[in-house]
Design a protein with these regions (language model features):
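Sec/Tat signal peptide C-region and signal peptidase I cleavage site
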Residues: 22-26
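Interaction/scaffold regions that mediate signaling and macromolecular assembly across diverse proteins
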Residues: 27-115, 119-288
Length: 288
């Protein structure tokens, strides 16, 4: 979830705050720095009548082999344990997706395609640079103030060079306008919603999106109340506009909150703070 903001160095952020005191509030500054949906209209092409399906079984096998949930409820990947054959299989899976004429598929199949491609490419990129403490340490994006891999054109789809940023902010967010997409794309960080254990498909997308929303909202890294003060994941500040159609972030959070959390939220109108943990979601970090 994750992903191409907060890339401005600390010094520049400090200068911004000094020059623009009204923006010093972290939430307000985050909103301004956050990437907005920017439609790449070339990817709106689809065939509503298509019944073709893409095989994501290779991604399912990878997830089944290397994902584990820690005692803290965070799903991590055993990056250091991924075998050479499985690395090659992951690259082959990504290549198979890149070769698909995705513009000829139906919308539901396209959504699953882009989410799985984003997540698989993110994991593959981590593996290429592992070990790292954070995905932000993979400094391959172009631009003076960029960090992380999100801005680099890592993929070629239907003759177009495509980055992870393109997939999230120019394809998924503007075309589907689905706030739960933030529970689907994974930025390989502890603070991010869990990478789900199953590949997305046209048939299971709705279930997985709801599952992801419930899991994140009801985990402390998504929503946390202490001494009557509400702390939310920075995702809800960065992408606040994506939740507007549901009545805003608070309405969205209440919708997916378990009964106990929902009751606690009744007397709270807004968050007091936002936080995010950019440490890598590496299974080795919780080994005894």
């Amino acid at each position: 979830m994750h992903r191409n903001l907060l890339r401005i160095p600390t010094l520049l952020a400090l200068v911004l705050c000094l020059l623009l005191p009204a923006l010093a509030h972290a939430n307000l500054l985050a909103k301004i720095l956050a990437p907005k949906p920017d439609l790449w209209s070339r990817w709106t092409a689809h065939d509503a009548s298509s019944e073709r399906r893409i095989d994501h079984s290779a991604w399912d096998r990878f997830l089944d082999s290397y994902l584990s949930e820690g005692p803290d409820g965070v799903v991590r990947i055993a990056y250091g344990s991924v075998s050479r054959p499985d690395r090659a299989a992951l690259r082959a899976y990504i290549a198979s997706l890149a070769a698909a004429p995705i513009s000829t598929y139906a919308r539901a199949e396209q959504f699953a395609f882009w989410v799985n491609l984003y997540n698989a490419q993110t994991v593959s990129t981590i593996l290429e640079h592992y070990p790292v403490q954070s995905i932000r340490d993979i400094d391959i994006s172009p631009g003076l103030f960029a960090d992380g891999p999100w801005g680099k054109k890592l993929l070629a789809i239907e003759g177009e060079s495509v980055s992870l940023d393109d997939i999230e902010h120019r394809i998924l967010r503007p075309i589907w306008q689905e706030p739960r997409v933030h529970y689907a794309v994974n930025c390989a960080s502890i603070g991010c919603p869990n990478l789900l254990r199953s590949a997305f498909t046209a048939e299971n997308t709705e279930r997985l999106l709801t599952q992801g929303a419930i899991a994140y909202v009801n985990h402390p890294r998504g929503v946390k109340i202490a001494d009557g003060a509400l702390t939310l994941s920075s995702i809800y500040a960065w992408f606040e506009g994506d939740f507007a159609a549901e009545g805003g972030v608070m309405a969205h959070v209440r919708r997916y909150a378990d009964p106990e959390l929902a009751t606690a939220l009744e007397s709270i109108d807004e968050a007091s703070a936002f936080e995010y943990d950019w440490r890598l979601n590496d299974a080795s970090s919780v080994r005894g």
